[in-house]
Structure formats: structure tokens, C-alpha cells
Amino acid sequence: MAGVAAGGALGAWARHGLGSWLTALLPSTFPLPTLMINVLGALLLGFVAGYGIERGRLPEAWRLPVTVGFIGSFTTFSTWSVDTVLLLDAGRWPLALANVGISLAVGLAAVWVGRRLAFRWRV
């Protein structure tokens, strides 16, 4: 459990740092930083699932700290949900629908790409 907590702390710290940097770099009415972080997390989880778990390269003791802890706290469903509701409340329906559609489609594609990369990795 301590490993999951440590992974969670690192993932939250990484999300905050990357999110702050992306927000300053890419100011927009669309929640692009949240989308980018969630897609990166989906790619990482796809890779870890394929390489670390399915191919057995990640020791059992590291699985939960990496997946549930780090990647789980790095990605954020709650922030994505709030971002979407705020767009709806502001009457920005097209942006809200784009956020939902793009997040789902690109997130699933990122998991798929992560797994494909994992199975091609030769180490």
C-alpha cells in the first residue's frame, strides 16, 4: 500500500507540474492540458499493460504502484468531467462535445498504440 501511495504522490506531482506548464504554454478555452495529460497517461498504461504485465516484464510488486498509483493519479477523470461541465455551463456545447469525443477516441487509440509499442519492444 505504501508503494501505491508513493506512486500516487509522484503521479499527482507530475500531473500538476505538466498541467501548469501546458496551461501557461497553451492558453485556450478548450481544456487541452487535461486532454494531453490523459492521452499521455493512456499511452503509458497501454505500454505498461502490454510490456510490463502481459509480457511479464514488470515485477508483481511494482504493478499496483505504477498502474494504480502513478498512472492513476497522473490521469484525471474528475478534472476532465469538470472541464466538460464548465464548457456546457458556458454554453460552449461544441467544445464540450469535442472534449468528450476527442478524449474517448484519442485515449483509446493511445492505449492501443502503447500496447503495440510494448509488443514490439525488444528489451
Swiss-Prot record:
Subcellular location as annotated: Cell membrane
Pfam families xref list: CRCB
Record field: transmembrane: 30-50, 68-88, 93-113
Keyword Glycosyltransferase set for record: no
Catalytic activity field: fluoride(in) = fluoride(out)
GO molecular function: fluoride channel activity; metal ion binding
BP GO annotations: cellular detoxification of fluoride
GO CC terms of this entry: plasma membrane
Gene, per the UniProt record: fluC2
Family: Belongs to the fluoride channel Fluc/FEX (TC 1.A.43) family.
Annotated function: Fluoride-specific ion channel. Important for reducing fluoride concentration in the cell, thus reducing its toxicity.
Membrane topology listed for this record: Multi-pass membrane protein
Activation/inhibition comment: Na(+) is not transported, but it plays an essential structural role and its presence is essential for fluoride channel function.
Organism (species): Symbiobacterium thermophilum (strain DSM 24528 / JCM 14929 / IAM 14863 / T)
Stated name of the protein: Fluoride-specific ion channel FluC 2
Annotated Na(+) binding sites: 72, 75
Cell membrane listed as a keyword: yes
UniProt KW keywords: Cell membrane, Ion channel, Ion transport, Membrane, Metal-binding, Sodium, Transmembrane, Transmembrane helix, Transport
Domain of life: Bacteria
